[in-house]
Structure formats: structure tokens, C-alpha cells
Amino acid sequence: MDVKAQVEVEKAVQILKLLGDKTRLSMMKLLQNNECCVCELVEIYKASQPAISQHLRKLRDIELVKERRKGHWIFYSLNKENSYYQFV
């Protein structure tokens, strides 16, 4: 396997591991058709703000989720341009 293919495999493994978490996977499905702020996700999942932010950071770091800032608010949505969007 060449280096580029190996890098792609490693990236796919990383993404699939992150999506193996039930909360993150359900967030991805929710964000597929909706843009949400952290406070909305806290209410939906009945979880702490730091916990929700941690999930979103992991999804943002691999570019499956994108953010849009409006004043003090940050809105999250699915990054449908990511080549791994199909896994969702």
C-alpha cells in the first residue's frame, strides 16, 4: 500500500472511531438538516455544556462539522463538503 492510501485508511479509521460514539453519531444526524448552537444541544442531550463542546470539538477537528459565528454565538452544522460525509 502506498503512503497516500495508508494516510487515507488512517483518516477513515479515525473518523469511524469518532462516529462509533452514540452521542456524536446522533449529533451528526441532527446537524445533517439543522444548524444548532451548543445551548440547544445541551438541552436536547441533557448533557453539560463542556461535554457537548468536547464532542463538537472532536467532530470539528476532523472537519465533519463546521461552525458559523454570529456575535457571541457559535452555530454548528454538518460539513457536507467533507469527503467522509458519506459515512454519516
Question: Where are each of the predicted segments found?
Answer:
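Helix-turn-helix DNA-binding motif, specifically the short coil turn and the N-cap/start of the second
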Residues: 48-51
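N-terminal positioning helix adjacent to the helix-turn-helix/winged-helix DNA-binding module
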Residues: 8-11, 23
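Residues within the DNA-recognition helix of helix-turn-helix
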Residues: 55
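Beta-hairpin "wing" of winged helix-turn-helix
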Residues: 40, 60-70, 77-78
